């Protein structure tokens, strides 16, 4: 381009060798001076010179007219080449979340990465599986490439077209602006447990940072520091997962009991069950103050059981040193529960079950080959919360077992939103509700990509399941607090 402008300059301002110079001496007449000192007739030098100068310039212009036309064409093409990208500048990035995405789970990590850098992210609800979009920012394309996330760079006009498609009143789609970086806490003991934790695994895989907390931190009142709290394979009844019958002699079980009793004593509690009930209450206060609680597996039903049984001894002697109250069932207060009501406690201390909230295998009649649950479809424009929590590229999710696998629908409170169910067995797998200024979500099962995860098994390798629809539901919940416009009040 620079060379073209140089040629144009040379054309408009020719060098001295190309044109006659005003400083050239005019040719003199061939007439010799006459004798006697007679005056010689002076030629019209100025007029002739100007004529020659004009004729020279005209000849030069004619001679180089073709060059001029060519240069003009070069300039026009160059200007058009610059103007075209400016008119259709690619200034948005679309991360599709449908079946074209190669790394669905890591895509959530990219969204989190952007929020950490104060880059707003548009969550395009129900558009191509719940895609993400954002304005281009330095380093983003490289970050996505490193993580293997599929993305497309699009123009302003293209993105405007997408937004218009979403805004159509007949389209069940909407845009949710993500602006806030959620502060995530995972409630889990410091020591290693003989089972994996789906949430910590997917957080690690997606490269989303979190803080590990447990009973000490909760009792010290540290929950208000966070926006989102996760509970996984936990027992809030103080019965150590009801593993007594099978694992009471296992070193990990004995260590777990020892650590729990030491923590209770350190915090002024005579029994672990009483401490766990207090911890559950603190978490309920966290929700009511504006927090987001997400629980899986046994942390779902055991949590509500602990709340219902506050002040009631539901625990037998092998767990707390004294017999349970025979009238414990009649003393339960279901009004304190988040999700369940009218359930019956499992009073047998050797039975690996807490209550009849969890559907039993013989009742379900399902196995790995036919265990599926369906996600509900909500109005994106009018029910954005459950819509966000159900974003997925699949609407039918393969089931997976856990200590608590599925919730008996007849025991779920009427104000609870059932987002995923297996209708033929009368069970819910994925439920949601509100309390005060906050919300909670319960998700049945232990590991979405390990149908029957057993104690002592190796953790799941999520690199083998980068587009797991079951794990996507977990990550929907993690991004959900980012859509909260107002600062959390606790």
Where is each model-derived feature located?
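Extracellular ligand-binding/catalytic regions of CAZymes and related secreted enzymes
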Residues: 91-133, 313, 409-490
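Short, basic, low-complexity termini and linkers enriched in Ser/Thr/Gly/Pro
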Residues: 1-34, 40-46
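Hydrophobic targeting/anchoring helices
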Residues: 86-197, 206, 445, 452, ...
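Catalytic cores of eukaryotic secretory-pathway lumenal/extracellular enzymes that build
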Residues: 268, 308, 317-319, 326-330
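Short, Lys/Arg-enriched N-terminal segments with co-localized hydrophobic residues
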Residues: 52-65
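Bacterial N-terminal signal peptides
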Residues: 69-83
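Helical hinge/lid and interdomain linker segments adjacent to catalytic or ligand-binding clefts
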Residues: 92-93, 98, 102, 132-142, ...
């Amino acid at each position: 381009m620079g060379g073209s402008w140089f040629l144009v300059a040379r054309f408009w301002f020719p060098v001295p060798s190309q044109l006659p110079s005003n400083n050239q001496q005019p040719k003199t007449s061939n007439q010799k001076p006459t004798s006697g000192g007679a005056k010689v007739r002076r030629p019209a030098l100025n007029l002739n010179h100007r004529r020659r100068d004009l004729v020279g310039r005209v000849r030069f212009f004619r001679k180089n007219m073709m060059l001029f036309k060519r240069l003009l064409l070069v300039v026009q093409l160059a200007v058009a080449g610059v103007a075209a990208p400016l008119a259709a500048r690619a200034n948005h990035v679309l991360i599709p979340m449908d079946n074209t995405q190669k790394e669905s789970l890591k895509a959530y990590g990219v969204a989190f990465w952007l929020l950490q850098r104060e880059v707003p992210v548009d969550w395009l609800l129900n558009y191509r599986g719940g895609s993400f979009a954002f304005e281009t920012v330095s380093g983003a394309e490289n970050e996505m490439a490193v993580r293997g996330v599929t993305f497309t760079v699009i123009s302003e006009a293209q993105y405007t077209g997408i937004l218009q498609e979403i805004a159509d009143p007949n389209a069940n789609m909407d845009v949710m602006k993500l602006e806030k970086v959620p502060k995530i806490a995972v409630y889990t003991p410091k020591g290693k447990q003989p089972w994996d934790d789906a949430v910590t695994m997917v957080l690690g895989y997606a490269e989303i940072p979190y803080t590990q907390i447990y009973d000490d931190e909760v009792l010290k009142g540290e929950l208000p520091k966070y926006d989102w709290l996760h509970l996984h394979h936990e027992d809030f009844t103080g019965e150590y997962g009801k593993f007594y019958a099978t694992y009471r002699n296992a070193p990990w079980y004995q260590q777990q009991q020892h650590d729990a009793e030491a923590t209770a004593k350190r915090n002024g509690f005579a029994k672990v069950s009483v401490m766990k009930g207090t911890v559950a209450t603190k978490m309920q206060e966290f929700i009511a103050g504006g927090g987001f609680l997400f629980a899986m597996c046994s942390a779902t039903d055991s949590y509500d059981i602990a709340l219902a049984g506050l002040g009631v001894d539901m625990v037998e002697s092998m767990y707390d040193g004294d017999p349970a109250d025979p009238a414990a069932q009649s003393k339960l207060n279901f009004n304190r529960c988040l999700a369940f009501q009218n359930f019956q406690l499992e009073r047998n201390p050797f039975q690996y079950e807490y209550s009849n909230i969890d559907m039993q295998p013989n009742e379900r009649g399902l196995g790995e080959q036919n265990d599926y649950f369906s996600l509900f479809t909500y109005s994106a424009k009018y029910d954005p919360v459950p819509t966000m929590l159900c974003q997925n590229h699949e609407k039918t999710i393969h089931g997976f077992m856990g200590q608590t696998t599925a919730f008996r629908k007849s025991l779920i409170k009427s104000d609870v939103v059932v987002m995923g169910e297996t209708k033929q067995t009368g069970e819910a797998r994925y439920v949601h509700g509100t309390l005060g200024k906050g919300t909670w979500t319960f998700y049945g099962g232990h590991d979405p990509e390990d149908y029957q995860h057993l104690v002592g098994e190796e953790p799941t390798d999520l690199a083998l399941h980068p587009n797991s629809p079951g794990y996507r539901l977990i990550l929907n919940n993690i991004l959900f607090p980012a859509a909260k416009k107002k600062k959390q009040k606790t």
